[in-house]
Curated annotation (Swiss-Prot):
Protein species of origin: Pseudomonas fluorescens (strain ATCC BAA-477 / NRRL B-23932 / Pf-5)
SMART domains, per the entry: YqgFc
Keyword Cytoplasm set for record: yes
Protein name, per record: Putative pre-16S rRNA nuclease
Main location: cytoplasm
Key words of the record: Cytoplasm, Hydrolase, Nuclease, Ribosome biogenesis
Family: Belongs to the YqgF nuclease family.
GO annotation, cellular component aspect: cytosol
Gene3D superfamilies for the chain: YqgF/RNase H-like domain (3.30.420.140)
SUPFAM superfamilies the UniProt entry points to: Ribonuclease H-like
InterPro entries associated with the record: RNaseH-like_sf (IPR012337), YqgF (IPR005227), YqgF/RNaseH-like_dom (IPR006641), YqgF/RNaseH-like_dom_sf (IPR037027)
Cellular localisation: Cytoplasm
Lineage: Bacteria, Pseudomonadati, Pseudomonadota, Gammaproteobacteria, Pseudomonadales
EC code: 3.1.-.-
Length: 145
């Protein structure tokens, strides 16, 4: 199955960043940030995104430790990925998201600065775009089959 459109998720316990990527261009861009309560999103909002974008797959970021070992959040992120698959029957992939939030904050500053706190003006969607871009770059061969 050719993957044409992919949604990327930067999973968090309070917010989940969402990005969209196109195989034809090999580019990802930020889409939105969903609120979560203790890691549980509003599944109706997730369903609306799935129905609107009709992704061929989803990519969920894995927050690995700097040494490459799984962090405590990895278990929750993988569970979120499995739930996306179970609820919406969409294939999922995971991708190392180390330093994407740090890089997203730097990108936000480069775009003209941060207005207020990161809680009020989150960078999660930027981080989702960065992790999805990394996945697209690493899986270009898979996308064009």
């Amino acid at each position: 199955m050719a993957l044409r459109l992919i949604l990327g998720f930067d999973y968090g316990t309070k917010q989940i960043g969402v990005a969209v990527g196109q195989a034809i261009t090999g580019q990802a861009r930020e889409l939105c940030t969903l609120k979560a309560q203790n890691g549980v999103p509003d599944w109706n909002q997730v369903e609306a995104l799935i129905k609107e974008w009709k992704p061929d797959a989803v990519v969920v970021g894995l927050p690995l430790n700097m040494d490459g070992s799984p962090s405590d959040m990895c278990v929750r992120a993988e569970k979120f990925a499995r739930r996306l698959n179970g609820r919406f029957n969409v294939p999922f992939y995971t991708h190392d998201e180390r330093l994407t939030t740090f890089e997203a904050k730097g990108e936000r500053l480069a775009r003209g600065g941060q207005k207020g706190s990161y809680r009020d003006n989150p960078v999660d969607a930027i981080a989702a775009a960065l992790l999805l871009q990394g996945w697209l770059d690493e899986n270009a061969g898979l996308l064009n089959t």
